[in-house]
């Protein structure tokens, strides 16, 4: 008896048809996923657009209030004594500064900058974050008078608050707040990386992590194979830019070896590049995933 021909009249096997159907289903599934992601992005853009529109409207309203108050004051200037005129001008300037601070806090609340009015002026709260992780918060209590001054604050002593205030507080309060935010966010980011290294990758460290209070100078020794016979690396990370979360100067040496082989020298240089371009805990996560083999994809 002759066997049945598994091919259809057009020469296509059943297996080929099924494989084609599976490819079509995969393409449909991928297209559906891309469509859903596009809709999500469009929804987020729409929400941000609405928020921007509200903030601009708030800014225009505040400007209108300031213009109205200026007009009211100017209308009364002709009927007051010279000393009274000076007092009115000073009061007008202070009110304008207060309105400016309120507008800044309203407009930039989503960046981690918020605050509330007090009997003396305004108390500003700066919430820091790194890689989407909310970290520490700090406050600065400002007295709105002439000159503006800081009444209380919780900023660490090693943050150059007085220097920042001397530069910007009297002339540009927005620049003062944003500059302070930069310093605090960078400090929190460096501290977060050092904490993660100690808590998550202690097995790779061959000694204690040494750091100063500002966390802009770190030094440590580590081995990629804790139980192996390889020599430990010694790393020194210096952050000259106190508003940065990546080091400006990195030195990696191989402990106990005067002359390195070509492979060890390449690995040492690769480590320096990684520490300069990626957060500390991400570099050690790469070491953990790859063992002794360095994950060079992080360098690109």
UniProtKB/Swiss-Prot annotation:
> What is the official name of this protein in its record?
Centromere protein O
Q: What is its main location?
A: nucleus
Q: Which UniProt keywords apply?
A: Centromere, Chromosome, Coiled coil, Kinetochore, Nucleus, Phosphoprotein
Annotated function:
Component of the CENPA-CAD (nucleosome distal) complex, a complex recruited to centromeres which is involved in assembly of kinetochore proteins, mitotic progression and chromosome segregation. May be involved in incorporation of newly synthesized CENPA into centromeres via its interaction with the CENPA-NAC complex. Modulates the kinetochore-bound levels of NDC80 complex.
Family according to the record: Belongs to the CENP-O/MCM21 family.
**InterPro entries per the UniProt record, alphabetical:** CENP-O
A cellular component term from Gene Ontology for this protein is: nucleoplasm
Quaternary state and interactors: Component of the CENPA-CAD complex, composed of CENPI, CENPK, CENPL, CENPO, CENPP, CENPQ, CENPR and CENPS. The CENPA-CAD complex interacts with the CENPA-NAC complex, at least composed of CENPA, CENPC, CENPH, CENPM, CENPN, CENPT and CENPU.
Residues annotated as coiled-coil are 18-42, 83-109
């Amino acid at each position: 008896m002759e066997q049945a021909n598994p091919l259809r009249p057009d020469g296509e096997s059943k297996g080929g048809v099924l494989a084609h159907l599976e490819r079509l289903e995969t393409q449909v599934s991928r297209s559906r996923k891309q469509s859903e992601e596009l809709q999500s992005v469009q929804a987020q853009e729409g929400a941000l657009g609405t928020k921007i529109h509200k903030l601009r409207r708030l800014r225009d309203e505040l400007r209108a209030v300031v213009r109205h108050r200026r007009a009211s004051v100017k209308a009364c200037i002709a009927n007051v004594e010279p000393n009274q005129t000076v007092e009115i001008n000073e009061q007008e300037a202070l009110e304008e500064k207060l309105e400016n601070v309120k507008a800044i806090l309203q407009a930039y609340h989503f960046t981690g900058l918020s605050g509330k009015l007090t009997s003396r002026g305004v108390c500003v709260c700066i919430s820091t974050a790194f890689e989407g992780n909310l970290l520490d918060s700090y406050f600065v209590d400002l007295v709105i008078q002439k000159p503006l001054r800081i009444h209380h604050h919780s900023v660490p002593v090693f943050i150059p608050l007085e220097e920042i205030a001397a530069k910007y507080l009297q002339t540009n309060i927005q620049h003062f707040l944003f500059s302070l935010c930069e310093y605090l966010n960078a400090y929190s980011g460096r501290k977060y990386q050092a904490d993660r290294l100690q808590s998550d990758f202690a097995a790779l460290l061959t000694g204690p992590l040494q750091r100063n209070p500002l966390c802009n100078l770190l030094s440590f020794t580590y081995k990629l194979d804790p139980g192996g016979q390889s020599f430990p690396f010694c790393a020194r990370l210096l952050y000259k830019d106190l508003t940065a979360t990546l080091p400006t100067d990195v030195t990696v040496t191989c402990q106990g070896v005067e002359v390195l082989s070509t492979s060890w020298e390449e690995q040492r240089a690769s480590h320096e590049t990684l520490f300069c371009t990626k957060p500390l805990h991400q570099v050690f996560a790469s070491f953990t995933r790859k063992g002794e083999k360095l994950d060079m994809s992080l360098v690109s």
